């Protein structure tokens, strides 16, 4: 087992002499920084309950992002929609039991994933086996922290409990298992804010700590590369932190543009999601770049792929094409009978000519499903902000780095050498990266009368149909007698 803790900051005044590498861990001053904790656990050291589940999967990736806006820095700039995302590739789909996985996932909170139909198939270019995805809105990690503390932390281990509780302020959490690596990688990210440099040592694992600043001054750096400079320390080693400087290719980059997301009013049952950008400036001069929006839509709302197949209609909304959608998507079923979690779509965006920098916007037509009745006749739902980025081609054969982040839902919809420049989401109001929409539903007070009226109407309709059938049968019974009498009269003449 090994652990790597990384601080990325812009405090050029930080003196390495202020870092104290003690037996108990590394201590330092408070600085404004982004922090990532990454723990790699070999398969053989995992709890048996978890290994029983993981052995059924070629790969399993769990991603959570906070709905609260936060700031970050390169290289930790990849974005996903707020909530819990699960991407699973079974070894043998026929023998995989999603109920076991769903049961384990309940430590994050009550999730509606018990049926296989709750998962949707998604594209995974690196595997010949079918892969499946699941999503559910998740406000925080409180339930996960409580359960994990009971399972993994001894009662008197204050360090273990404190580190788990610190996840309450994390902006993201990733759990990744890959059968080829035969290990579970757990990483948590804390946003840019004042934090004290404090990392406890451990006798059970090797702990490395890196404290870096972004450094673009290094010679021979390429456009798609990032550089960092700082110090690296191995806890338990009484040596002073070692100076370190290096460059690496970056798959995810931070773009300078900002976007907001809101539903145009009035919404009705067919709301339009508007994405507004402060700039149409290209993020990179190297390679071809195009902007995209990757939407995660819960079962209460969906996009009509047939409507988004009309090129003239798309052009009027500053869209280019529906590049991808998960399936199936039932276009008629109400939310309370829909078994799948929802759907994901990738939309190409059409910005103005980059020759003149200016703000711009796109409009995405969506459709609400019918919801259950409520006492007020209205139900409020939330839709997570999409991940919005420029996808730019590069000439690099690989973009792998110590800080690389894969399996975020949209990365495998592009070539492996694609660089993603992420636009920064800005809440329309408050600090939450969620769009609220009010859905008109049936009033609870009117349900009884509507049901009675429907029953009466059905009964009357049934009686009318039966009366018509009986009338036709009676007429058909009399007709042959009249015809016979008329035939006999003709023969007598």
Curated annotation (Swiss-Prot):
Keywords for this protein: Endoplasmic reticulum, Glycoprotein, GPI-anchor biosynthesis, Membrane, Transmembrane, Transmembrane helix
Lumenal side: 1-453
Gene Ontology MF term list: mannosyltransferase activity
Any one biological process term the GO annotation gives: GPI anchor biosynthetic process
Cellular-component GO terms for this entry: endoplasmic reticulum membrane; glycosylphosphatidylinositol-mannosyltransferase I complex
Membrane topology annotation: Single-pass type III membrane protein
Record topological domains on the Cytoplasmic side: 475-493
Residues bearing glycans: 318, 429
Domain of life: Eukaryota
Subcellular location: Endoplasmic reticulum membrane
Entry's transmembrane regions: 454-474
Pathway this chain belongs to: Glycolipid biosynthesis; glycosylphosphatidylinositol-anchor biosynthesis
Protein family per UniProt: Belongs to the PIGX family.
Free-text function comment from the UniProt entry: Required for proper folding and/or the stability of a subset of proteins in the endoplasmic reticulum. Component of glycosylphosphatidylinositol-mannosyltransferase 1 which transfers the first of the 4 mannoses in the GPI-anchor precursors during GPI-anchor biosynthesis. Probably acts by stabilizing the mannosyltransferase GPI14.
Name of the protein this chain belongs to: Protein PBN1
């Amino acid at each position: 087992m090994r652990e790597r803790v990384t601080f990325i900051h812009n405090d050029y005044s930080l003196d390495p002499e202020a870092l104290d590498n003690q037996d108990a861990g590394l201590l330092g001053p408070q600085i404004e920084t982004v922090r990532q904790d990454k723990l790699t656990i070999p398969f053989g050291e995992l709890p048996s309950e978890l290994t029983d589940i993981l052995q059924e999967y070629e790969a399993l990736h769990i991603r959570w992002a906070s709905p609260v806006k936060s700031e970050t820095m390169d290289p930790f700039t990849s974005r996903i929609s707020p909530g819990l995302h699960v991407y699973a590739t079974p070894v043998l789909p026929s023998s995989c039991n999603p109920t076991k996985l769903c049961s384990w996932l309940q430590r994050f909170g009550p999730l509606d994933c018990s049926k296989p139909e709750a998962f949707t198939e998604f594209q995974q270019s690196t595997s010949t086996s079918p892969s499946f995805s699941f999503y559910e809105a998740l406000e925080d990690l409180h339930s996960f922290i409580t359960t994990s503390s009971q399972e993994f932390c001894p009662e008197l281990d204050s360090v273990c409990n404190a580190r788990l509780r610190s996840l309450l302020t994390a902006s993201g959490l990733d759990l990744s298992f890959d059968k080829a690596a035969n290990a579970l990688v757990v990483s948590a990210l804390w946003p840019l804010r004042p934090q004290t440099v404090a990392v406890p040592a451990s006798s059970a694992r090797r702990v490395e700590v890196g404290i870096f600043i972004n450094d673009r001054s290094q010679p021979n750096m390429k456009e798609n590369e990032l550089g960092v400079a700082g110090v690296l320390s191995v806890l338990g080693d009484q040596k002073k932190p070692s100076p370190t400087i290096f460059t690496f290719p970056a798959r995810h980059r931070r773009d300078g543009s900002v976007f907001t997301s809101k539903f145009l009013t009035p919404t009705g049952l067919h709301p339009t999601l508007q994405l507004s950008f402060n700039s149409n400036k290209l993020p990179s001069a190297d390679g071809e770049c195009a902007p995209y929006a990757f939407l995660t839509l819960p079962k209460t709302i969906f996009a009509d792929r047939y409507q988004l197949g009309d090129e003239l209609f798309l052009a009027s909304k500053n869209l280019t094409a529906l590049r991808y959608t998960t399936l199936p998507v039932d276009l008629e079923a109400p939310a309370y009978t829909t078994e799948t979690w929802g759907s994901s779509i990738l939309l190409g965006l059409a910005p103005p000519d980059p020759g003149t920098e200016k703000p711009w916007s796109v409009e995405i037509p969506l459709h609400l499903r019918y919801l259950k009745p409520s006492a007020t006749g209205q139900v409020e739902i939330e839709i997570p902000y999409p991940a919005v980025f420029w996808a730019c081609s590069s000439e690099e054969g690989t973009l792998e780095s110590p800080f690389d982040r894969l399996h975020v839902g949209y990365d495998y919809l592009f070539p492996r050498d694609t660089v993603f420049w992420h636009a920064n989401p800005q809440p329309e109001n408050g600090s939450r990266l969620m769009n609220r929409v009010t859905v008109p539903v049936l009033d609870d007070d009117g349900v009884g009368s509507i049901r009675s009226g429907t029953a009466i109407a059905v009964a009357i309709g049934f009686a009318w149909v039966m009366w018509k059938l009986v009338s036709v049968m009676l007429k058909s019974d009399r007709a042959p007698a009249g015809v016979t009498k008329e035939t006999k009269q003709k023969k007598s003449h």
